[in-house]
Amino acid sequence: MDELRLKVAVQKSGRLADPSVDLLVRCGLKLSRGKDQLVGYGENLPLDVLFVRDDDIPDLVQQDVCDLGLVGLNVLEEKRLELSARGHPARFQCVRTLDFGRCRLALAIPQGSPWDGTRSLRGRRIATSYPFLLAHYLRERDIDAEIVTLSGAVEIAPRLGRADLICDLVATGSTLQANHLREVETVLESHAVLIRTPLDLPAAKHEWVQRLLLRVDGVQQVRESKYIMLHAPRSALPEIRRLLPGSESPTIIPLEGCADRVAVHAVCRENVFWETLESLKRVGASALLVLPVEKMLA
């Protein structure tokens, strides 16, 4: 691989795989990748994408094999605690919080089991794929419990007699329900993050990292943004500006032949609901139009 091209590690399969690639594509990347290939080539940007296991991503960035990585905060913090326990500092840097991959690492007990807060954990066996995060959680609360480390199928551990309860990732909770478990405590709120190597990169690479970060910011702002256009009486402008959700100063344009009315254009960085439009109309707005924003650079 060309050392002057950025190397970005993403999950090859799983809940973060498609959103990670989609983010890069929305940042302008045209990715060439054959079926089952583990490396994708950026045709229009000096960037290659490595498709790997999610728990390998922090290591690849830590060891400077990859310049950037998109990974879940749960995986990143588990690796950080593991490195610390082994006397090694975590060298990767978290540079962006991403707006996908939201879930939580949670404790769950069999349905019907009593729960009296975290004191119920004392002396219990807890199955998990995140032993370092769980150990950190227990240590902070001075709780002595046995951690049973499993690489998968954690949710069936209580039914197999391997554990009394579990600590696992929860998104919708449907898997817990299917296995007759109920969530009782949150250990960590998680989401996708973008990490980078701490190395001083060559100037060309550094420039592309900065450009990519700027594009990521733009993509995430666009997802939350709408462009609103409307007509309104000049006298209603203070109230209209108050009602526009999350907008900066709007653009005010005089209307031809209507001295007392103007056109208002604004980018709103929050959701625009029907109730918002109805409130705007009540204070005198008309010809309201809400458009999606395709690209934005702050």
Give the ranges of each region predicted by the language model.
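Small-molecule-sensing regulatory modules
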Residues: 1-47, 71-92, 97-99, 104, ...
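Short, structured active-site "lid" loops
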Residues: 46-68
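Signature of uroporphyrinogen-III synthase
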Residues: 59, 104-108
